[in-house]
């Protein structure tokens, strides 16, 4: 396990680089036979790792020494030298390169902000994958707020400091990063370029945008969730007031110019009685909207997944996932929760009587199976990542896989479960501080643990969609706007 702490690091290494084509065996690749950096860089230097971070002080230079191998020239911050003392401010980076002939290997050390969350890393993640995370949520503890993109070594290669708690950060074309704020005070998703500048906002025509989900369709529209208050509802059968406001769950699709093209609401489709298990929470803890209206959150929509003409919707407080025919609005099937005529029969699931408990992050895979993060909330069991095969002809949901982590005992909220291209899983364990990757059989492969914080989701992104060069350039641009350090 590795923890980022200021200290002295002295590492003896041998770095090899290769160019295109084949080279004669007698030609030695550029190498560094020794490196020292003060304060400590994370992770330890390795020729295969090109991005590092350091906790630095602008008044105290980062001191670097690099010893080249035979026939190689070291370059520190672009200058041919073996030692340097470089002053860095937050977000700034220094490069260390080694050159032999036309072959160069470059490495990048970037200064973390002093308030960037602490984290530890175990193992190595799936190659070719980034992880977008928002490690800022905590239970009663004030913290700085960041959207961050980590590489397979658990190194934050890009980050953006936000004014409020970011939630549901996701990659959009550009590349850009979109996120909402928690609680949903902004009533919009902000879209930021990698240099931090605001590229736009996604808003709901109704104003009460939810902060749980944003999807982009193939034609460029945006699909998201909306808080939909329904007033003057008699809630006395459920232990509530005779004249209450129910917070219905609503899905909206808008164009990039915010024109509404489709919507669907739980109102008229999902009965309040489907939330019976959650009544103590619903009635005991009303939700106050940004305009001050007190409401009762019977449904708590938290995830949407698009599957051609079908939309999957997760409602936390019915313990159910609903398949909605986009053309008719009809519920085609339901997985979990209070039985209804649309309910699927669950097959092969040891928790089949209650397959879902406050679940999050339903996703449809290319093969038609679905994955979901089952929080197991208030069911006396640990959370899990689950995959089901849905058969509409037999009206069944057959469990194919489940992933658990013995280090994670409970989950009260949040979480995500994504299958990677190689069949591994990446899981954010809800209200727990762990983001992990697991083999298909559940074997732990990689883990990031945030110090007392958790990320609403962990979103894997293929490197084919986002390059390290783009992330570094974005960070360099943000650093230049703040306070360039004297070199």
Task: Please name every model-derived segment.
Residues 20-25, 38, 43, 47-50, ...:
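Intrinsically disordered, low-complexity, compositionally biased regions/tails
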Residues 2-25:
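Secretory targeting and sorting signals
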Residues 19, 35-39, 81-82, 327, ...:
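Intrinsically disordered/low-complexity terminal segments and short unstructured peptides
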Residues 14-16, 38-40, 485:
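Compositionally biased, intrinsically disordered low-complexity segments
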Residues 110-487:
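Histidine-/acidic-rich catalytic cores in large beta-rich domains
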Residues 24-119:
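Beta-rich interaction/scaffold domains
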Residues 3, 7-8, 31, 87, ...:
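Acidic/proline-rich low-complexity IDRs
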